[in-house]
Every structure is written in C-alpha cells, then in structure tokens.
UniProtKB/Swiss-Prot annotation:
InterPro entries xref list: DPD_II, FAD/NAD-bd_sf, FAD/NAD-binding_dom, Helical_ferredxn, Nuop51_4Fe4S-bd, Nuop51_4Fe4S-bd_sf
Superkingdom field: Bacteria
Entry protein name: NADPH-Fe(3+) oxidoreductase subunit beta
Gene Ontology, cellular component aspect: cytoplasm; plasma membrane
Cofactor binding remark: Binds 1 [4Fe-4S] cluster.
Amino acid sequence: MAQVVFSSWGRTIVDNRKGGEAQDVSFRLPTTLDGERQIAAFMGWDGIILYDLKVDVPAMAAEYMKRVQTQYCCGKCTPGKKGTKVLADVLAAIIEGRATEADLDTIDDLADLLTNCKCTLCQSSTIPVLDAVKHFREDFLAYITGIRKPANVHRFIDKYTAPCMDRCPAHIDIPAYIEAIKEYRFDESLDIIRDNMPLPSVCGRVCPHPCETHCRRKNVDDSVNIMVLKRSASDYEWMHNAAPPMQPKPQKNKKVAIVGAGPAGLACAYYLALEGYPCTIYEALPEGYGGGMIAVGIPPYRQPRHLLQRDIDIISSMGVDIIYDTRIGKDISLEELKQKFDAVFLAPGAHRSKPMGVEGEDKGYKGFLKGGIDFLREAYMGRPTGMGKKVVVVGGGNTAIDCVRVALREGAEESTLLYRRSRKEMPADVWEVDGADEEGVRFEFQVLPTRVLVDENEQVTGVECVRMALGEPDASGRRRPEPVPGSEFVVECDTVIPAIGQDPDLSFIPDNLGIDITKWNTVVTKYVPLKDAAGKDLKDGMGNPLARVLITDLEGVFAGGDAEIGPLTVVACIGNAHRAARVIQRWLEEGKAYLTEDELMEDILTNMPVYDKNEKVPWLDSRERAHQAEVHGQERASKGNYQEVELGFVDTQAVEEAERCLRCYRVAMAAI
C-alpha cells in the first residue's frame, strides 16, 4: 500500500516526510497509472500530492508551469500571456542555477498578477507552484546555490480539464465551444463539439446535461445553459444549410462490424470512419429508424426525427454502411461477423423491458402492455399500441415520464403515473416531470401496484395498490419505501404500462463463444485495475471499474454503451463508444487493446473532484441564465401533436448566454 508522503491537496497539509507515525490519508488519486507504473506525484488546481520522496518537486513545478505557458495558456489576456511566461522563466532559471533567493519572492508577486487573468486556467496553475515553494523551499534553495542538479528520474504526463468537461461523459471541450459562440463563430463551435460528439442535434436537446451541475457559474448565480448552446451551434449549421467539414482519412483495408445503430454504434462508426476504417452497422429496426433508442425511445417532441436523420446521414456520408432489418443471431450470426470482419463492436442497446413483478402481469390480459419501451416503439413507428383511454404507467424514470406524455398524444383521456417513492426521489429529470405536470398527467406518489384487475373478458379494469411510507435510506441513498398496512386501494384504468427499466437483449451471443455475461445481463470487458493509497479499488460513479478497455475475452470483439454497462444516457453511450473506437483502432493497427496515457489521465481526473460546490467564486456581475423559448399549455399534448416543445435560442441570445461562461480550465500533471 502506498503512503502519501506530502499533500497540500484541498488546502489541507499532510506531511509525512520526516517519518515516524504517518498520518493516515487517502485520495481518489490512484497509486499507479496503469496498474503497474507508479504515480510518484501529482500537481494540479488544488495543490500537490506526493507518493515518492525521490520526486524532484522544484523541477516538477518548473515543468508544470512551462507546459501551462506553452501548451494551455490562451494568450488572450496580458496577465496570463506575460505572467505565465515570466513565471515559467523564473522557475527555469532556478533549476538551471541562474536565480537568486529573491526570485522566490518574485514567484509570489507573479502569482498575485495572475489573479487578474480573464479565466482561471492561469490563476489555478499558481496554486501547486506556490505550495511547492512554501513547503519545499530548501529544495529550491539547493538549486539556487548550485548544490542540486536535475536528476530526471521521473517522466511527466499532463492533461487539461474543467469542472464541466470533467462531468461530461463525452468529455467535450465545453469552454472552447462556448468561447467560439461568444465570438459568433458557430461553425467553429460545432467543429469542437464534433471532436467528441457526433450527434450534436440530439445531445443539444435530450442530454441530461450533468455538466451544468458542475458549472462554477452556479456558485455565482446559475449555471450556464450548456446544452442549449450546443444545440445552437448545431441548429446554426442546419438552418444555414452548411456542409459539415469532416474529411475522413484514406480508406484502410481492415473492416469493422458494429451491432446496433444506436448512439454508441453510430459514434463508434463515426470515429473509426474518420480514421479511414470501413464500418458496417447491422440494425434490427427497419430503415428510417436509425438511432436506436433515440428513434424508438425518445419522443419526437423532444428530438425531431428529421434532425436525428440529418446526423445519421452525415455519418453515412463518411462511408459508413447501415444495414437495416437485420437481427444478429437470426439473420446473421455473431460468428459470421467475426469471420468476415477484422473487429466487431457490440452496441445493441437496451430494448428489453423489465417485468413489474405483480400478480397477473404474465396472464396476457388485454390492456396490460409488455413494457414502456415497447409502447413507445410502437407509437413512434405508427403501429397499434393496444392502449385504451385510461392509462396507468408504473415507474419513475424518464421512460415512464415519456410514456405518460406520449399516452396523451396517442389519445388517452387520462394518463396517470404510479411511483413508489416521492416526487423528489424520482430518477427522472425534474424538467421532464414538470413538463408532464403541465400537460395534465396525474401523479400518484408513494404507491406500489400489487395486482392487475380484469373483468370476465380478461380486459384490464384497474390496478390494486398499497400506499408506501419512506423508511431508512437504501444503498442508492434514497429512502426505502415500505408498505403501509391496510392502505390498499384501486386505481381504475383500462391500460397498464410497466416502465421500471430495461435490459440489453444479449441472446444473440452464443454461450460457447467465450464472451462472458454478468448477472446484470451486460457484457464483461477488460479494465485497468486502479487503487488509491488506502488500497481501495477506484470505480466510476456507477460502481464500475474506472479505466475500462472495452474489449471482451473474445479476441477482436469489443462492447460498449448499454450492452457493456447497462442502460445509459445518450451522451454516456457516445463517450463510451468514442473510447471504444480509439481502442479498436489500436487493435487494428498494433494488435493490442490498451488505454493511452492521455486516456488514463482522463479517467483519473474524472475520478477526482474538479468542481467544488462550496468554492466562493469572486465575480462582480450577476446575469440571469437564459432559458430557451418553449410551447406551453396542455394543448401541446393534444392527440397527434408531436411538434417540438423546446425551441432553442436565437443567435444573439446564444452569444449573450455564452458570455456568462467563466472558462474554468484546470491543468494537472503526474510524475511517473
């Protein structure tokens, strides 16, 4: 187990350099980069963490500031451009033995100057340098007096991030694309977005925007409307009939098969096609329904289908072939794909509804529908849904909310949602719940269905329920619902739609092929084992291994999206698939599947808290967050009305909202 030798991280000093009884401390920083190579030290926006006393802290500080100045400083303000240059030069002079002790005081003065920078990249970069000078002053003096020379024992790896980037599953360079919008360069903004997001019109509309929960502007007044700014860049290209500028590399002779044309499959194909690899996507749905769960799971009033199709057409134009109406395991086997292609990426999505577990659900009653995902798919494809006039949906996630809202648009006279916890504890996005409320959906909270009621013709007539009281928190942190004795009651209805979750259908994977499946019905992939200083395995926010390589135990077969980790958001599927595409490329070119140092650093930074909700952000002006125009009133949910509800920004509104961004970049560097 590694020991923290010194740390100033989080403004708390831990100093074990003199030996003796060590302070027991741990961080979410792994002790190795890849399970083998030790991380000896780490410098960043919140200080220094030292695992190895042999690390040359002055030399590391000098290299850190050199990289900040030459690689990351934007040069758009004088304090940043000049201040970082002088500071880097002073530190270099110290390491080269050309400085005096007075130069250590100059470092303090330069740090004060950098507090006037237009963004926080240069400001935050002074923190580890000042900590180094303060707590390792004797080491700096040893360089100044000529006693010490650079040992060059360690190699340094750097990476930049921002609180919003760190929280984005696709790691889009959010400050950069917002900066471009601020300068009315919408086309350049979209280029930046597409570096990590090939479905911008989709994620500009349906993304749950976790980035906004970590926006430092929120510490001043309210977060920047990051999602709608992304939509603004995409809408600008569409409304101006501009051609996307992507230019794939010359086509290579190795081919990739992709199972599923959902967000993960499309994203993987996009990034491989950019590198020149021919990709063939096999999609079970018919032509016209590319996009997977976006096409048959997300309502058109949230995501217009013509804009989804535009994103898909752009990907197809890069040489990606999508074969529709083809089910793997039925029309073509996975073994055949393995033989015909050099690599296979499994991204079938999660289209199988979970059972409710109530009495009568397996009897085939009229009006008891198979599941929420199935109901939505039939509705969007224009098929009979089997829905009546009084609809009950069971669940509390976004799919359940989509079902109650779509039921109204399909002609339901009453649409009711039953959820076993409180409104506050619903996993659905708050704005989607509010939208359902506005459209006239009826909610029954803290209610658990126990039995489906039917008449003599086996037609559903209602659901027997019991009231629930919220007890102690469970493993998810939410209070556990417990039945209230004697509280049984009936909700009258003619249709019941269970929408309590969905799973991938992996029945197309033969048992004898060598691909392992978890007890959660997801594909097992390899990962890099990372532990912190306390020996604890580091995992992501969903409890999965932090640094996943996305290759299965079957050589040349990879998995991503819902199939690899369970139901994910669109943006999480895309981030996952982008990583898979890079790993697949290395597999095709080198015969090895691994994560690069840059990718490992990306995972490490994601695991460390870049955003501090308690930070006091000094900012003089307070400007209200811009909200996009929206169609209001119950008439927007009238029968057959799938017109888009949220209308986006006009260009000037987007520019004004972009000006609220504080450009909160951070630079981190590890000694290996």
